[in-house]
Amino acid sequence: MLTNSERVKVLSEALPYIQQFSSRIIVIKYGGAAMKNQKLKDQVISDLVFLSFIGLRPILVHGGGPEINFWLDRLKILPKFDDGVRVTDQPTMDIVEMVLVGRVNKDLVATINKQGGKSVGLSGKDGLLITPRPNGKANLGFVGEVQNIDTKLLKILINNNYIPVIASVAADKEGQSYNINADTVAGEIAARLSNAEKLILLTDTPGILRNSSDPSTLISHLNIQEARDLTQTAVISGGMIPKVNCCIRSLAQGVASAHILDGRIDHALLLEILTDQGIGSMLVV
């Protein structure tokens, strides 16, 4: 339990950040344990609504891997992966779209609205928000990359104080649906919005670690060159590589900072954005 003086200190520490980030866009990729655990999910949504009420303009991009796997199993379709990427044939694509757009997205929208926010659920198909292209690996099926982002619809929503919630599914000009990595979608959206302040990736790790098995080796602040050097020396490895590359790409296109943080921590978003110390890894140019 905080004392009265500690409560005042917390509020005082947050004030400069509230002033600095007022009316600025933050793009948050949401997935992992924070999506599976109901308590963490409620806290993420509560943080999101709070940030909206104090003047920030959050955009939420989500995945939904565990829910997809649940429905594939229920329909007796065996999930397949290649180097950690979901192999997406047409039956799998149908399930991915049903789950991400029809279930996960609408549940998040309803939760935001229930907590007092105003939210609109979207997929990449809505308003031609995302134009995909095949990723070039035929064995992966309908796994896509981002070819283009049209931000007009997002700007209308955030300018009217709505929180866009985006499922990472899109369709090409022939109407073929593609499953796109949610980290990639979040990074590309942040990069295409000229006044995006932050890209935040919620993960199941503390951030970028010098020793992947030791949370105390968290690197709390680094620039693009340092991130590239750590990748070359294999300090950054495995599943962290595409996340860091996503951050680097968004920074190179004008996003002020990119953050990788542990979504399993209570109120991770508020701690990262509104405190001096933060809790994750912040990348800057």
UniProtKB/Swiss-Prot annotation:
The keyword Plastid applies. Its EC number is 2.7.2.8. It is found in: Plastid, Chloroplast. Pathway: Amino-acid biosynthesis; L-arginine biosynthesis; N(2)-acetyl-L-ornithine from L-glutamate: step 2/4. InterPro entries: AceGlu_kinase-like_sf, AcgluKinase_fam, ArgB, Asp/Glu/Uridylate_kinase, NAGK-C. The keyword ATP-binding applies. Keywords: Amino-acid biosynthesis, Arginine biosynthesis, ATP-binding, Chloroplast, Kinase, Nucleotide-binding, Plastid, Transferase. GO terms for biological process: arginine biosynthetic process via ornithine; L-arginine biosynthetic process. It catalyses: N-acetyl-L-glutamate + ATP = N-acetyl-L-glutamyl 5-phosphate + ADP. One of its GO terms (molecular function) is ATP binding. Belongs to the acetylglutamate kinase family. ArgB subfamily. Catalyzes the ATP-dependent phosphorylation of N-acetyl-L-glutamate. This is Acetylglutamate kinase. It comes from Pyropia yezoensis (Susabi-nori). The lineage of its organism: Eukaryota, Rhodophyta, Bangiophyceae, Bangiales, Bangiaceae.
